[in-house]
Amino acid sequence: MNERYFAVVAAIVLACSLVGAVVSATDESQQDESVADWSADVPDVHDVAEPPDDGVATLGDREFDSVQAAVDAAGPGDTIVLEGRFDERVTVDTPGVTLEALERDGAVIDGGEGGTVVEIVADDVTLEGVWIRNSGYDKNVDDSGVFVNGSNATLSALRVTDVAFGVWIGSVDGATVEDTIIAGREDVPTAQRGNGIHLWETTDAELTNNSITIVRDGIYYQWAEGVVAEGNTMWNMRYGVHYMYSNDNRLENNVAFDNDVGFALMVSSELTMRDNVAVNNDGTSGHGILLKDVEDSEIVGNELVGNDNGLFVYNALGNRLVDNLLLENDVGVHTTAGSSNELVAGNSFIRNGEAAFAETNSQLNWNGSERGNYWAEARTVDVDSDGIGDTRYRPAGTVERLVHERPQAAAFAESPAFDAVRMAESSFPVLESPGIVDQRPLADPPHDNWRDYYADHDH
């Protein structure tokens, strides 16, 4: 810390001694409300009756008691209809084949806890409505419910349970996974599980309306590009979504709740993350969204609620963090490790323990635009009623830095002495201490739906 910082701290301590033990006022409505019980509407992954009969695979006018036998007899473009229970592992090596259950969950393929249950090695294969379960346990050989090694595969309305990896898509293009339920093994520790959907050197995949739980990471990207993930729900795992070395991908309208981290975006660029929800992700790391070594990406319109850190920004450069709701997180935004050149505007910071915290030795000027962010605790004055505060706001200035480093000082957070320092920092550059500066704070929150998280715990 520099000498100026010590001088400011000394002034605060002296002022506090004069005003006595003044504690901050409490908003009783905030104390009485909590988002802790919020949950999304998710399926019971095991609430399904097992087909009672032995399996029958129908190919045209022929019937087989083995899926593999039917696949071996099929030609390109054929459809095989499945009903009942099959205890086997299947390899689909004929292009254009469709395997579909007579009704959803009306056919089970049980792998007997050995290896991958269904392996697709041909192009243009469709697998629909089938319950796939009991893969092997060996992550070193990628034991999976479904292993896709053929382009343009479509996996639709599957139930994939008690598996190491749910769906592994490796080095192929154009895969679709939609309306599918994936659940791993509850008796396997989280760190030892596979991922729900694992994308390896994959391009142009579409992942839509899937429900994923009890895995390590819900959707894992590794050198994957051009992937669209929309409408998926991930809960009870390490990371809901995890990017590594994966550029030019889009996440939209996904929900991640009750995980360690909702969305972990790492070592990637040109990502678009829009209109997603991250709630109550408060495990060891505890981030709604983690941006680590991410560049030139858009984080827009997301709702980050009840996490340890709503948004944790680590060595991230040149990103747009715009129009997000940050509600009731321990820290709204935590920025560190040289993150800079971010446009941060149009966000609503409401009822967070700390709105923002910056580990920096310099001043971060957010929003070089016509609007800033809404800070619920800012007491913004807008004399000309243009919606923009008349003075800048320091959400992470001298006082916030002191309280973060010396928690015992929180008792004086709303004292006249602390308010005087905030006013000086906001009104004119007398105290240009390190931290965050919002040059054009908003008078009203852009998000008028934030109370919905209290009114209805089922999203």
Task: Label every model-predicted segment.
Residues D72, D87-E100, V108-G129, R133-A153, ...:
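Extracellular beta-strand-rich solenoid/capping regions of secreted or surface-exposed proteins
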Residues T126-G226, W235:
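Right-handed parallel beta-helix
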Residues I80, V90, V97, A107, ...:
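Solenoid scaffold repeats with emphasis on beta-solenoid/beta-helix
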Residues V45, A49-E83, E88-R89:
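Acidic Gly/Asp/Thr-rich repetitive segments characteristic of extracellular carbohydrate-active
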Residues M1-P52, V56, A70, L99, ...:
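Secretory targeting signatures
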Residues D32-P52, T284-G288, E328-G338, L343-H459:
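Functionally critical loop-and-helix segments that line ligand-binding/catalytic clefts
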Residues G111-V118, K139-F147, D162-W168, P189-L199, ...:
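Extracellular beta-strand/beta-solenoid scaffold signature
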